[in-house]
From Swiss-Prot:
It comes from Vicia faba (Broad bean). PROSITE patterns: 1433_1, 1433_2. SMART domains: 14_3_3. SUPFAM superfamilies: 14-3-3 protein. Disulfide bonds: none annotated. InterPro entries: 14-3-3 (IPR000308), 14-3-3_CS (IPR023409), 14-3-3_dom_sf (IPR036815), 14-3-3_domain (IPR023410). This is 14-3-3-like protein A. Coiled coil: none annotated. Pfam families: 14-3-3 (PF00244). Belongs to the 14-3-3 family.
Length: 261
């Protein structure tokens, strides 16, 4: 007779079902239950990837909505349609509230549970990178002092992750490469520092290329995929720093192995 699954195992299974059904809000709820069930224990690689996928999809839909609405707002402003602009701003504010709530939810979980319980180098980098990502998402739409605070928090988290990654993970490790990818996007998009963005991306790419022959079959696909994204961004940024192609900028996607959706 098969052993009855633990609540933790049931929540993981339900999260996978929710992912298949593309019901990502529920996927987040199930993975938060997994996190609560493990207490001070660390999540498995599979569990942390599921948590990351869930939140990335929930936030990703709102980020896309915000960009579309902001673009429409700019067009209506240029046409002088003040009535439309007022309606659009209210709608954008609603989306921004949702974005804030999602980001604050995962950031609280990272600070209270996930980062303190991380014991291994790859776990620490994974969660600190995640912390940087969600502060960066806040910086995308905040303004004034709030934007400054979000940007500073992003920089602190990414730098902490980078310090650990550079000492504990090889240059070809997909989590280290994913961190470099997102950190460089932060420099380019949030800090408006294309030189730093290109420098970071190029260094990560070159260091990984130098050790490509040591890459195991297990992570070869993931690592080379992120290296391609780094190279794509470098091409985009260096070809024309003034180009409005920011929407094409690649960043590491939800899974721990940074595969794009």
């Amino acid at each position: 007779m098969a052993t009855a699954p633990t609540p933790r195992e049931e929540f993981v299974y339900m999260a996978k079902l929710a992912e298949q059904a593309e019901r990502y809000e529920e996927m987040v709820e199930f993975m938060e239950k997994v996190t609560a069930a493990v207490e001070s224990e660390e999540l498995t690689v599979e569990e942390r990837n599921l948590l990351s996928v869930a939140y990335k999809n929930v936030i990703g839909a709102r980020r896309a909505s915000w960009r579309i609405i902001s673009s429409i707002e700019q067009k209506e402003e240029s046409r002088g349609n003040d009535e439309h602009v007022s309606v659009i701003r209210d709608y954008r504010s609603k989306i921004e509230t949702e974005l804030s709530n999602i980001c604050n939810g995962i950031l609280k979980l990272l600070d209270s549970r996930l980062i303190p319980s991380a014991a291994l180098g790859d776990s620490k980098v994974f969660y600190l990178k995640m912390k940087g990502d969600y502060h960066r998402y806040l910086a995308e739409f905040k303004s004034g002092a709030e934007r400054k605070d979000a940007a500073e928090s992003t920089l602190t988290a990414y730098k902490s992750a980078q310090d650990i990654a550079n000492t504990e993970l090889p240059p070809t490790h997909p989590i280290r490469l994913g961190l470099a990818l997102n950190f460089s996007v932060f420099y380019y998009e949030i800090l408006n520092s294309p030189d730093r963005a290109c420098g970071l991306a190029k260094q990560a790419f070159d260091e990984a290329i130098a050790e490509l022959d040591t890459l195991g079959e297990e992570s070869y696909k993931d690592s080379t995929l992120i290296m391609q994204l780094l190279r794509d961004n470098l091409t985009l940024w260096t070809s024309d720093m003034q180009d409005d192609g920011a929407d094409e900028i690649k960043e590491a996607a939800p899974k721990g192995n940074d595969e794009p959706q």
